């Protein structure tokens, strides 16, 4: 089980909307209470679900694509940026994420760099005590 910033990343599921394909990809996940992005390997099981399978790699701050995410309310959301080839984005350091409490249950936003499509997601833990609200709304 992967642990980042004192948080267990498995088991959890991320419900996403608007993703166009099924398969494996790489997401950079902004971990609550942390100013960096951590890479995690994920597998899209169907068009609505994606599961974090494992965590690997070093921590990087957001790439250039995250800069325009400011149009969303940064007080209400975390950010996740999806890349098909993260090597092409490493070094494009722009800014860090806002600091968040590790217990903060609010939703995440996914930015799919391959389609330039922004998606909001909620992280739903299978552990009931970590279950987060299911309400989804755009920032």
Which residue ranges define each predicted feature?
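Conserved P-loop
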Residues: 2-108, 116, 120
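P-loop NTPase motor core
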Residues: 108-139
